[in-house]
Amino acid sequence: MKTDQPPNSTGPLPKLRNLHPNIWAATATSFLTDISSEMIVYLIPLFLANVLGVRTAIIGLIDGIAETTASLLKIYSGVLSDKLGNRKWLAVLGYGLSTIAKPFLYFANSWGWVLGVRFGDRAGKGIRTAPRDALVAASTGEETRGLAFGLHRAGDTAGAFLGIGIAALIIWMTQTNDSLLSVATFRTAVLVSIVPAVLAVIVLAVGAKEVTVAGKKSSVMRLSLKNMDNRFKSFLFVIVLFTLGNSSDSFIVLRAQERGLSVLQTMFMLMTFTAIYTVLSGPLGALSDKVGRRRLIIGGWLAYGLVYLGFAFSATGWHIWALFGLYGVYYAATEGTAKALVADLVPDTQRGTAYGLFNAAIGLSALPASVIAGALWQGIGGWNGFGASAPFFFGALMALLACVMFWRWVR
C-alpha cells in the first residue's frame, strides 16, 4: 500500500497550502457527513416531543445511550488503529455504518425505534472518530496541528450550516403551521439526508491515504493509561467533569421551543450558531498554536458557563437565539483545540489509543449528563423535576469547576 509522509510546513506562520491532502479529504468528508446529519439530528428531539409525546428524561436517555455506544467503540477503534497502523479504512467503515443506519428513521413510530437507529448511527461514529483524528494528527506537524484540526472542524460546521439550511427549506416547503414538527417534514428530511451521506463515504475512500508513523506498532490490543503522560490523565479527568454538565444540545432546542420559537425559527437559530462556529473554528485553531491550547480551552469553557447561565435566566425565545449564537464561540474555541492538545500530550504511536480514551471519556459521561439534565427538567416517574432552567444552572456550575481543575492540574 502506498504511504505518504506529511509535508513539512515552512515559514513562521502555518499555511493552508502546506497541509497534507488527508486533511482536505477528512474535511470534505466531515462537510458532507454533517450536511446529512445536521438535517435531522436537531429534528429528532422535536419529533420525539411533538409527534411521539416523549418526556425530556427519555429524550436524554436516548441521546445518552447513543453517545455512550459511540464512546465504547471509540476506545477499541482507536486501539485497533494503533495495532494495525491503519487509520483510513476503519474510518471508512464507520462512515459507511452510519450511512446505512440513518434511512431507517423514516419508519420510526416509537422512541424505541428512534433509539435503535441512533444506536447504529453513533456506532458508526464510534468506529470512525479515533482513527480519523489519528490520521489527521499523523498528517501534520506540531506547528500546524491546531490549524489542521481547526480546518477540519470548520468543514464539519460548514456542512452543519448547510444541512440545517436544507432542513429549514424543507420545513418551509412542507409545513403551513411550523409551531410543531410534522411527520411528513421529518420523513422528507431523512430521505434527502441520504445523498450527502453516501458521497462522504466515497470521498474518504478515494481521497485519503495511509500515513506511515515512526515507531513500533502496538502488538497487543491493550487499553491502558499506565504509560500515558500524567498531564493527559489529568486532562481526561477534567473532561469528564466538564461533560457531566454538558448535556445534549437537544435540551437547548427544546428550551427554545418552550420559550416560543417555532420549528423554522429554531432552524434559523441553529444556523446562526453554526455560522459563528464555522467562521471562528479555523482562526481559533490556529490561535491555539500561538497562545497555547490551555488558555483557549479555559476561555471557551468560561464562555460556555456564561451562556448556560443565560439559558437558565432566559425569558423569551429570542434570548435563546442570541445566546446560542455565542455558544458557537465556545465550540470553536474548544473542539479542535482539545483534540490538538491530546496530540501534544502523547507520542505518535499512542495517538489512536489516546483519542479513543479522550472520546470515550466524553461519550461515557454523556449518558449521565443527558439523563441528569432530563430528570432535572421534567423529573422521572412521579417526580416532576425542578423545571426547564435547572439543567442549565447545573451545566454552568460544572463548567466553572472544570476550569479551576484544568488550570491547576494540566500545565
Describe every region a protein language model picked out.
Residues 89-104, 194, 295-310:
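Structural signature of the two symmetry-related core transmembrane helices
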Residues 172, 194-215, 402-410:
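C-terminal membrane-cytosol helix-exit motif in multi-pass small-molecule transporters
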Residues 61-79, 271-284:
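Central cavity-lining transmembrane alpha-helices of secondary-active solute carriers
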Residues 46-51, 162-184, 368-387:
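Transmembrane alpha-helix termini and helix-breaking/packing motifs in multi-pass membrane transporters
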Residues 12-71, 232-269:
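Helix-loop boundary and gating motifs at the non-cytosolic
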Residues 2-20, 209-239:
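Juxtamembrane intracellular "pre-TM" segments in multi-pass secondary transporters
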Residues 117-158, 341:
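Cytoplasmic helix-loop-helix junction between adjacent transmembrane helices
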Residues 150-168, 359-369:
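Glycine-rich segments within core transmembrane alpha-helices of 12-TM secondary carriers
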